[in-house]
């Protein structure tokens, strides 16, 4: 039985009346209960905190028993085994895939920040295509939910990228669910009600572009900073919970600002402060690199080393540079050349085998002649005497 299809009424203490309250509040499954949590559940359903805590606890235990979510306590081996189910979505470029260790990871938030024109939205459009590729081609064969807060989603761009990847544009567009957010409250609401759509549409990637734009424009001045961060934190936590409970990836773009107290180095800083920084699993910095090139740098990661990758924007969306492709071709030819070389024998084996072209098998000695005792001239004398005596010559010596 699929855990995602467990009915809410299967839970102890959830009758028809409670079930209706939950569904009216946008809670349709046990996963939704775990994602929301007891505090938020009480706010949206008007149920008492005791009932909410009881329902969420029962749902969490039920899901943990079936292996849908991690138990409260688990060994390192269990966590390692669970992480084997984590998927990777290719970025469409060898350089970025190598930088990220295979691509965008599920059950995690990958934050991409950078100034305008650095390629963030183009990257999002590219991921709309690569996510829907089959697993053998680096995708997950699932849909995409695109939360558009700036009105920058362009289906025409998806069509161009799809054609460049030899994929059906119409089918790809049908696999993208776009939600246009007009204010920060609407942005949070979209995510709160996303659970049912994620299950029904087999969503494997959630794109939030941009994550902080609406919060930044609505909450101005230091006096509103606390309220903004509290609301933004709730949105980011929802993203993290959804990514883990539904085993999907989250790609969140972020705006930047300049730090006035930075006298050396790059003054560019991502917006959102520690609230966004602590919630993001991976932080990638996009910057312009001259002409059509862009540079991606890992700023924060639990296991990736700090490194950079160069890519460019083109017909395929984000793509490898010509220099990188030439380098890959050069390395491939070198590998083929090395594989074609004959295997060299070790000195010991070569000595045992003897010189090349010479039979190393010991020669058969003439029968009846002690070559070890006789000198070369003695052997010649013996042969001569045998011939003079009228005896047939040994055929081995002729």
Curated annotation (Swiss-Prot):
Stretches with biased composition (Basic and acidic residues): 320-341
Gene: radA
UniProt-listed GO biological process terms: DNA recombination; DNA repair
Pfam families in alphabetical order: Rad51 (PF08423)
This protein's name: DNA repair and recombination protein RadA
Species of provenance: Cenarchaeum symbiosum (strain A)
Family named by the database record: Belongs to the eukaryotic RecA-like protein family.
Lineage: superkingdom: Archaea
Gene3D superfamilies, per database record: 5' to 3' exonuclease, C-terminal subdomain (1.10.150.20), P-loop containing nucleotide triphosphate hydrolases (3.40.50.300)
């Amino acid at each position: 039985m699929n855990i995602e299809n467990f009915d809410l009424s299967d839970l102890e203490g959830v009758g028809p009346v409670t079930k209706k309250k939950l569904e009216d509040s946008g809670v349709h499954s046990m996963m939704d209960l775990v994602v929301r949590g007891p505090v938020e559940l009480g706010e949206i359903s008007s149920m008492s905190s005791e009932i909410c805590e009881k329902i969420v606890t029962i749902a969490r235990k039920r899901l943990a028993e079936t292996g849908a979510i991690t138990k409260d306590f688990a060994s390192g081996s269990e966590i390692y085994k669970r992480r084997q189910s984590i998927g990777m979505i290719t970025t469409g470029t060898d350089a970025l895939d190598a930088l990220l260790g295979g691509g965008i990871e599920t059950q995690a938030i990958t934050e991409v920040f950078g100034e305008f024109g650095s390629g963030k939205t183009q990257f999002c459009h590219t991921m709309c295509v690569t996510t829907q590729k089959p697993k053998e081609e680096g995708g997950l064969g699932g849909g995409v939910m695109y939360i558009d807060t700036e009105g920058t989603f362009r289906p025409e761009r998806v069509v161009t990228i799809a054609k460049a990847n030899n994929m059906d544009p119409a089918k790809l567009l049908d696999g993208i669910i776009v939600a246009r957010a007009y204010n920060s409250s609407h942005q949070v609401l979209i995510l709160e009600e996303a659970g049912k759509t994620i299950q029904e549409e087999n969503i494997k990637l959630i794109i939030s572009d941009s994550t902080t734009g609406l919060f930044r424009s609505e909450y101005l001045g230091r006096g509103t900073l606390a309220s903004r961060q509290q609301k933004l934190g709730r949105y980011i936590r929802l993203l993290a919970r959804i990514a883990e409970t539904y085993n999907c990836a989250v790609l969140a773009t972020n705006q930047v600002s300049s730090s006035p107290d930075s006298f050396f180095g790059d003054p560019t800083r991502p917006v959102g402060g520690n609230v966004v920084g602590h919630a993001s699993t991976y932080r990638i910095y996009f910057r312009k690199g001259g002409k059509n090139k862009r540079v991606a740098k890992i700023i924060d990661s639990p296991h990736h080393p700090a490194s950079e990758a160069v890519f460019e924007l083109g017909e395929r969306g984000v793509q490898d540079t010509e220099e990188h492709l030439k380098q890959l071709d050069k390395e491939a030819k070198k590998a083929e050349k090395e594989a074609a070389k004959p295997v060299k024998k070790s000195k010991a084996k070569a000595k045992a085998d003897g010189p090349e072209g010479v039979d190393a098998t010991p020669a058969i000695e003439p029968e009846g002649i002690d070559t070890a005792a006789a000198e070369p001239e003695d052997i010649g004398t013996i042969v001569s005497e045998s011939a003079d005596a009228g005896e047939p010559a040994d055929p081995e010596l002729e």
